[in-house]
Amino acid sequence: MDKNQITRRAFLAASTTTAVLTGCASSQKPNTAKVVPGKVSPNQKVNVACIGGGGKGLDDMMNAKKAGANIVAIADPDWNRAAEGFYKCKDAKQYKDYRVMLDEMGKDIDACTVSTPDHTHAPAAYRVMKLGKHVYCQKPLTHTIAEARLLRKVAQEAKVVTQMGNQGHCQVGVRELCEMMWSGVIGDVKEAHVWTNRPIWPQGIAAPLPAEPVPAEMDWNLWIGTAPERAYNSKYAPFNWRGWWDFGCGAIGDMACHIMDAAFWSLNLIEAETFTAQAIVSEGMTDQTPPLKSTIKIDFPARGKMGPVSVYWHDGGILPTRPADIPADQKIGDGNNGSLFIGSKGYLTAGEYGGHPRLLPDSKMADYKKPAPSIKRVSHNDPYYDWIECIQNGGKTASNFDYASPLTVVANFGNVALHAKGEPLIYDVKNGKVTNNPKLNALLTKEYRKGWELPV
């Protein structure tokens, strides 16, 4: 190994490896029959299998069902967590290992939801798409940048219908925000701020938690999936995994695909060939967990007719400085979450999902007429209807992986910047590399536990 190369786990106290996906608990050969988009009749229900059946998995399951899907199978390593989903979809076959489910039921499945902790998104979605199945994957799309690039590539090759679960992207508010921005009402935007009240789970923890007995209903080995082995503790699952590097992506990973979406879309950041990220504030980060609070500055060069812009991410209670000409009694964003765009002619703000966009100060909205709609609205303003209808009729969803992957890359690169401890890092979008500190490219991927590897 080149002496300048270090591993992600060297930062997080381990080592890295890559290989081809080989893991499957069943020896049965996976079914590879391909479901062609648009070949499921609009009058025919889409057979959906759910990877993750509790919490957000239950939400995704029931929303897919509401949109017209037929839930045929549910896989979850924690059957206590999945119990409500099992009850509400009694006819669905029940599994602990989604790989066994796909092996045994591949021919009966058209599509899958992936609603698992971040670290297992990519292996599940990868396997689903390799079988020619459509996929709805929760945000952030992946745990690492390399995984995000891989899933985009595989989705293009498989020609399947994909959707990431940043539901605000399908709603009217963010579309109105883009139309307002593109009308030029606030002029040239050189600075934007995005913030969240997350983390609402513990972070800043220096060591793994002590071992506890594994609940009888849980297969802890399956839950760990790709991550290095560690003892079970109830403070990892089912929720607080978000605050552990091995399982989650911290506050920016959890929320940027929601809150930063408005900036990413309206400022056309997807067109940037490079960008630079720097951690301005980082308090309490450890090898085990993300920081208690952070501010990350991400600089994007000019894109088409749009000039350079700096986007600031704030979490852990940090808020952007209120502009002097916005009265103190006027809300910016939703308060604890939101975005603020600072233009040469004024200000534009929006809520958590890009909703309720409005000019500031409030007086600017008194006589303002929003532009006529120019962006297509999504069926029912709903990502699940969008996904199911595109499976039946063909076409691309709003947050398909060609969009979701680059958005996830920006969010995950914020975490890479946190590990650089204040050093500005330059990212080459086309080649997927850090250009000014190559040793940090190890942080764009991760170690995979044997049996769960991906070709990244």
List each language-model region with its residue ranges:
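Conserved SAM-binding strand-loop segment of SAM-dependent methyltransferases
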Residues: 93-97
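Short amphipathic alpha-helix with an adjacent loop that forms part of the alpha/beta core around
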Residues: 100-107
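N-terminal Rossmann-like NAD(P) cofactor-binding module of classical short-chain dehydrogenase/reductase
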Residues: 111-113
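Short, solvent-exposed turn/loop segments enriched in Gly/Ser/Thr/Pro and often Arg
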Residues: 78, 115-120, 141-143, 148, ...
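N-terminal secretory signal peptides and thylakoid transit peptides that target proteins
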Residues: 1-19
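Contiguous beta-strand/loop segments that form the cofactor/metal-binding neighborhood of enzyme cores
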Residues: 176, 188, 193-195, 202-249, ...
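Beta-strand-loop-alpha-helix segment that lines the small-molecule cofactor/substrate pocket
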Residues: 117, 122-170, 184, 422
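N-terminal Rossmann-like dinucleotide-binding module
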Residues: 18-89, 168-171, 181, 263
